From Swiss-Prot:
This is NAD(P)H-quinone oxidoreductase chain 4, chloroplastic. The keyword Membrane applies. InterPro entries: NADH_Q_OxRdtase_chain4 (IPR022997), NADH_Q_OxRdtase_chainM/4 (IPR010227), NADH_UbQ_OxRdtase (IPR003918), ND/Mrp_TM (IPR001750). It is a multi-pass membrane protein. Belongs to the complex I subunit 4 family. The lineage of its organism: Eukaryota, Viridiplantae, Streptophyta, Embryophyta, Tracheophyta. The gene is ndhD. GO terms for cellular component: chloroplast thylakoid membrane. The chain crosses the membrane at residues 4-24, 37-57, 87-107, 113-130, 134-154, 167-187, 211-231, 242-262, 272-292, 313-333, 334-354, 386-406, 417-437, 462-482. It catalyses: a plastoquinone + NADH + (n+1) H(+)(in) = a plastoquinol + NAD(+) + n H(+)(out); a plastoquinone + NADPH + (n+1) H(+)(in) = a plastoquinol + NADP(+) + n H(+)(out). Its EC number is 7.1.1.-. Pfam families: Proton_antipo_M. GO terms for biological process: ATP synthesis coupled electron transport; electron transport coupled proton transport.
């Protein structure tokens, strides 16, 4: 048992160190860049050390617990703790944020504020994944919005203000329902209001109230995850944001919704989840098909990748709705797998459009000749995204398939039907991704821009791409790397649904 406050340090370090950026000497951007990257690296090494030496995989209970009184009059505590569900997400956050900071190297305008906002997001994300108090969870959920809004509205494309406003309206609207749910949970039933997750797990509610609470939380997660029809902020946001912001959005922000769905709706409201799970599976199946076919009609290649993200989130929703050991592990695997693949596709799309100043597919063609390295990596990650065997996307989708098929909750015919719909979605994925590759990279049409200024990706970009490619291949070949983290915790969670 470690009594050292590891998690508090992990949560506070980025935002505290980030606030010191403004006091660094004004000697160009170099100092600020190196300072930010070293903070991200230090944080990532600290979390890796803490999890390697102080976290027991076999123990399904909460570990590295911390509990400090914060606001005494409200009985509000700073409670942190991690288990198998959150370890993977925290490591993903550290990994992607460090590489996104490296990807943001070319940002020179207001670079101090930019890097500070990235570090503030880092703190909020780790705080969310490790919080053990519902109000703290909500605060971290909200803390995320301000940096993302500023990153979008200050460093984006031509329609950045429109997309940033749309993002904040959607997410703030979802958060109102979240807050009502949090207050409803805290004030129900006991004389002492308290939001400790340990206490709330054992709390039972009247069926109507539980369904209302579940629905309130679900709306908030449906915006973040996103679940159709609340997904329309995502393509606009990804189409306009700077690619390092896109990496954080696709890699981590979307996963917060999935994490909340497992952590709060599944754990704290099991009866409502049992009732709603068939609907979740149906929505997930519709989402896979709908987003894949919408993606096919997008002219802007960034928006095409954004819709592919929405489609892949459908697998996570189905895994969570299947209420099986295999399905839920598959959903967690897909959370991490898409975190790597989605972030990289946006990074590649951003670096390519920065070089060409074009985003519409009909204006492109033949880019593979001046940019062979970008072409190779783009093709490789597109293959990972369309679930090529040997890469992480394939394993994740396969495990979710098995989870749905083995679910005792559904009858055979609905299972067959939903599996068929998922299979159609998996056929549409290669169609829209490969047609995008063909339009961008193949052919002889080299556009009106003088081709002399085309540079292929440099060592910094290749380093980022190879760093992400290794875990994608690693998880694809040996999925137990990730599954071993969550498998005991998932079993403990599902014992509420199927008592032995």
């Amino acid at each position: 048992m470690s009594y050292f406050p590891w998690l508090t340090i992990l949560v506070v370090l980025p935002i505290f160190a980030g606030s010191l950026i403004f006091f660094l000497p004004h000697r160009g951007n170099k100092i600020v860049r190196w300072y930010t990257i070293s903070i991200c690296l230090l944080e990532f090494l600290l979390m890796t050390y803490a999890f390697c030496y102080h976290f027991q995989l076999e123990d399904p209970l909460i570990q590295l617990k911390e509990d400090y009184k914060w606001i005494d009059i409200l009985d509000f505590h700073w409670r942190l703790g991690i288990d198998g569900l959150s370890v993977g997400s925290i490591l993903l956050t550290g990994f992607i944020t460090t590489l996104a900071t490296l990807a943001a190297w070319p940002v020179t305008r207001n670079s101090r504020l930019f890097y500070f906002l990235m570090l503030a997001m880092y703190s909020g994300q780790i705080g969310l994944f490790s919080s053990r108090d519902l109000l703290l969870f909500f605060i971290m959920w909200e803390l995320e919005l301000i940096p993302v809004y500023l990153l979008l509205s200050m460093w984006g494309g031509k329609r950045r203000l429109y997309s940033a406003t749309k993002f904040i309206l959607y997410t703030a609207g979802g958060s109102i329902f979240f807050l009502i749910g949090v207050l409803g949970m805290g004030l129900y039933g006991s004389n002492e209001p308290g939001l400790d997750l340990e206490r709330l797990i054992n709390q039972s509610y009247p069926t109507t109230l539980e369904i209302l609470l579940y629905f309130g939380f679900l709306i908030a997660y449906a915006v973040k995850l996103p679940i159709i029809p609340l997904h329309t902020w995502l393509p606009d946001t990804h189409g306009e944001a700077h690619y390092s912001t896109c990496m954080l959005l696709a890699g981590i922000l979307l996963k917060m919704g999935a994490y909340g769905l497992i952590r709060i709706n599944m754990e704290l409201l099991p009866h409502a989840h049992y009732l709603f799970s068939p609907w979740l599976v149906i929505i997930g199946a519709i989402q896979i098909i709908y987003a894949a076919s919408t993606s096919l009609g997008q002219r802007n290649f960034k928006k095409r990748i954004a819709y592919s993200s929405v489609s892949h989130m459908g697998f996570i929703i189905i895994g969570i709705g299947s209420i099986t050991n295999i399905g839920l592990n598959g959903a967690i695997l897909q959370i991490l797998s898409h975190g790597f693949i989605g972030a990289t596709l946006f990074f590649l799309a951003g670096t390519a459009s920065d070089r060409m100043r074009l985003v519409y597919l009909e204006e492109l063609g033949g880019i593979s000749i001046p940019m062979p390295k970008i072409f190779t990596m783009f093709s490789s990650f597109s293959m990972a995204s369309l679930a090529l065997p040997g890469m992480s996307g394939f394993v994740a989708e396969l495990v979710v398939f098995f989870g749905l098929i083995t679910s005792p909750k559904f009858l055979l015919m609905p299972k067959m039907l939903i599996t068929f719909v998922m299979a159609i979605g998996m056929i549409l994925t290669p169609i829209y991704l490969l047609s995008m590759l063909r339009q961008m990279f193949y052919g002889y049409k080299l556009f009106n821009v003088p081709n002399a200024n085309f540079v292929d990706s440099g060592p910094r970009e290749l380093f980022i791409l190879i760093c992400i490619f290794l875990p994608v291949i690693g998880i694809g070949i040996y999925p137990d790397l990730v599954l071993s983290l969550s498998v005991d915790r998932v079993e403990a969670l599902l014992s509420n649904y199927y008592p032995k």
